[in-house]
């Protein structure tokens, strides 16, 4: 069982859900050009929250965490309940490993909006990074309860359960992921991974054969077959 693989998957899920800035992919130079243009606009409209949010978003794209945090602080001085600023400041704090500050921002969001899925996922991820996996699992249980139709909560919870070797629960959650997105090969492989960890190799082999029959790349399956020898 590759714990690092599951930790990376958790991070991937959270990042995809968190950093939904809605901006097009650009090169670093293009982002820098955009940043210069935004700075010029801010000079003309220094109190525009929208412009400061856009500038901070570009800072995030360039991984300029401190600059982004400064922008969000500026916004929050005038509007302490700006959820967007709190949300992405927490994201930046997480990248800087300032977990207590990230936790505080996510909690402030949840006080205002208890059903904010991305904030709760972000908080759960911070708890995992802090080594508080049981607390993280409690949060993910709430995410799934509040958003039963969203695959993201199930993926995050299943990944953590797998990492914690809570295989019965993980197997159920991977099944739920597959129900919601049956064409996602990664979910099927994660399900098979848990079956192998549980010693259910024949069931795992049947599932692998199904994937092979669907044309899934053999390179992705080879390691799983080898684990069952």
Regions found by a protein language model. Name each.
Residues 28-36, 63-74, 96-108, 130-142, ...:
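Structural signature of tandem alpha-helical TPR/SEL1-like repeats
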Residues 12-20:
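Bacterial N-terminal signal peptides
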């Amino acid at each position: 069982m590759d714990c690092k693989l599951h930790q990376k998957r958790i991070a991937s899920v959270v990042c995809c859900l968190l950093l939904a800035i809605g901006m097009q992919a650009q090169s670093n130079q293009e982002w820098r050009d955009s940043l210069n243009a935004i700075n010029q606009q801010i000079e003309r409209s220094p109190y525009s929250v929208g412009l400061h949010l856009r500038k901070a978003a570009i800072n995030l794209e360039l991984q300029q965490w401190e600059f982004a945090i400064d922008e969000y602080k500026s916004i929050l001085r005038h509007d302490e309940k700006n959820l967007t600023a709190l949300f992405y400041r927490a994201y930046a704090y997480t990248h800087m490993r300032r977990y207590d500050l990230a936790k505080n921002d996510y909690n402030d969001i949840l006080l205002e909006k208890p059903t904010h899925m991305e904030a709760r996922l972000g908080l759960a991820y911070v708890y995992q990074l802090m080594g508080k996996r049981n607390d993280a699992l409690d949060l993910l249980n709430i995410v799934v309860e509040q958003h039963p139709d969203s695959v993201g909560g199930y993926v995050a919870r299943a990944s953590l359960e797998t990492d914690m070797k809570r295989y019965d629960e993980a197997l159920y959650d991977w099944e739920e992921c597959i129900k919601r997105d049956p064409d996602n090969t990664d979910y099927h492989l994660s399900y098979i991974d848990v079956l192998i960890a549980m010693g259910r190799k024949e069931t795992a082999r049947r599932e692998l054969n199904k994937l092979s029959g669907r044309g899934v790349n053999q390179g992705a399956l080879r390691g799983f077959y080898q684990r069952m020898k």
